[in-house]
């Protein structure tokens, strides 16, 4: 018994034939499967066609695009095809990242996305802390804080009221 070549069509149970080379399923009798006056004779069954050629992380770049092919003396063939263009949302995100402000350290050329992170980094070069001279500290454990709200949250741990008692 000879095995069918991958280019031959495989007949399905429900009157559909599968073309493995193109990755499409064709319907023989589409009269009962019409929806809202649109007949779709060919449909890409899954992303398996793309999966054979691309790594898993690359598959996410594919999007479904409708394709219509004119035929001689019949209805046009309409099917969905996986296109490899990136999604517009992805492009917007890349442009947003490109226009974002960056802050660079003059000493080591490291780059940060916020000025606060750059200040903390520069303090490491100097060997000094970034705590202000009038920093807030916990009267119980002497832990220091740069913001009053952080001290208040910490004081709950010791069950201290706002006055420090």
UniProtKB/Swiss-Prot annotation:
Q: Zn finger regions (C2H2-type) covering which residues?
A: 103-125, 136-158
Keywords, A to Z? Metal-binding, Repeat, Zinc, Zinc-finger
Skewed-composition ranges (Basic and acidic residues): 1-10, 19-32
The residue ranges crossing the membrane are none
Named from the GO MF annotations, one term is: zinc ion binding
Mind telling me which SUPFAM superfamilies this protein's record contains? beta-beta-alpha zinc fingers
Q: Where is this region: Disordered?
A: 1-38
- Protein name, as recorded: Zinc finger C2H2 protein ECU11_0990
């Amino acid at each position: 018994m000879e095995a069918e070549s991958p280019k031959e069509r495989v007949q399905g149970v429900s009157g559909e034939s599968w073309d493995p080379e193109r990755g499409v399923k064709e319907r023989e009798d589409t009269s009962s499967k019409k929806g809202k006056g649109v007949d779709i004779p060919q449909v890409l069954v899954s992303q398996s066609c793309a999966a054979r050629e691309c790594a898993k992380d690359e598959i996410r770049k594919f999007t479904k695009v409708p394709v219509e092919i004119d035929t001689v003396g019949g209805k046009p063939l309409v099917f969905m095809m996986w296109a490899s263009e990136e999604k517009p949302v992805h492009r917007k995100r890349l442009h947003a990242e490109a226009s974002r402000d960056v802050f660079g350290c003059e000493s080591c050329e490291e780059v940060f996305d916020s000025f606060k992170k750059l200040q903390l980094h520069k303090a490491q070069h100097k060997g000094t802390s970034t705590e202000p001279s009038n920093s807030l500290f916990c009267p119980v454990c002497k832990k220091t804080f740069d913001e009053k709200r952080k001290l208040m949250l910490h004081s709950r741990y010791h069950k201290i009221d706002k006055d420090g008692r």
